[in-house]
Design a protein with these regions (language model features):
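Non-catalytic cap/lid and distal C-terminal segments of serine-dependent acyl enzymes
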Residues: 1-237
Length: 237
């Protein structure tokens, strides 16, 4: 399996950002890390091994990006406004740096984005906010309400980065149609700590007539990383 490490000084993040690339061709797949994870997390947790066939056969080229939650939502050394500000910088990094880099590496315009837990939140949020840039999102064991990380702080920035809120109140038919064009998959398993949160997000999407697929696997586990890579593999096609 071809594996390449890339790193550059990110103007958006104000620091060096690492990236691991697996494979050399196929549909681009961006993988966000979970809480306190980094660009190596998917490989360390068996996710890349689970995708070995897709990568080696040229079905997917995988891009594992660096941490966002540890410096933003989970950083309680800074206030909620600063947490969201840091996350906004991360979104800018994805849109203004990562996507142009991927387009130079891979001519396929179809972009899949995925993540586990808070990584699933990031993946879904990016697809909802930028539905013309991402064609498919696979949320794995995700939760989609970031108010749990905001210390009861509420403002417009929280609102527009919180899918359970801004999607619920979105009435612009043009934007809703663009979002409906995204292939949305939300997956979880029976005893997952985020199963209810995934169901809530699915219910909101249905209320807005946004077509998507939502599955709860009939399996139990004490470790979502035991199941999430298998879910991802089954939903890439």
């Amino acid at each position: 399996m071809k594996k390449v490490h890339k790193s550059w000084e990110s103007p958006c993040m104000g620091k060096s950002m690492d990236l691991l690339i697996y494979g050399s061709e196929g549909t681009p797949l961006i993988l966000f890390p979970s809480a306190h994870g980094d660009y190596m997390e998917w490989e360390k947790r068996g996710g890349i091994q689970a995708l070995e066939e897709q990568i080696n056969e040229g079905y997917n080229q995988v891009f594992c990006v660096g941490d966002f939650a540890g410096e933003s939502f989970l950083n309680h050394a800074i206030d909620p406004i600063q947490r969201l500000s840091r996350f906004s910088q991360y979104q800018s990094y994805v849109m203004d740096e990562l996507l142009p880099f991927i387009s130079e590496e891979n001519s396929n315009p179809y972009i899949i984005v995925s993540g586990v837990a808070i990584g699933a939140y990031c993946a879904l949020l990016m697809a909802m906010k930028y539905p013309t840039n991402f064609q498919k999102v696979i949320g794995l064991c995700g939760y989609y309400d970031i108010r749990v990380h905001m210390d009861d702080f509420i403002d417009n920035n929280v609102y527009f980065n919180n899918p359970v809120e801004f999607i619920s109140n979105l009435n612009d038919d043009k934007i809703l149609k663009l979002i409906s064009n995204v292939d949305i998959r939300l997956l979880n398993y029976m005893n997952s700590p985020t199963k209810n949160e995934t169901q809530i997000m699915s219910d909101i999407l249905w209320l807005k007539y946004i077509e998507h697929e939502q599955y709860v696997w009939d399996i139990e586990s004490d470790d979502m990383w035991e199941i999430a890579p298998k879910m991802l593999k089954d939903n890439l096609f």
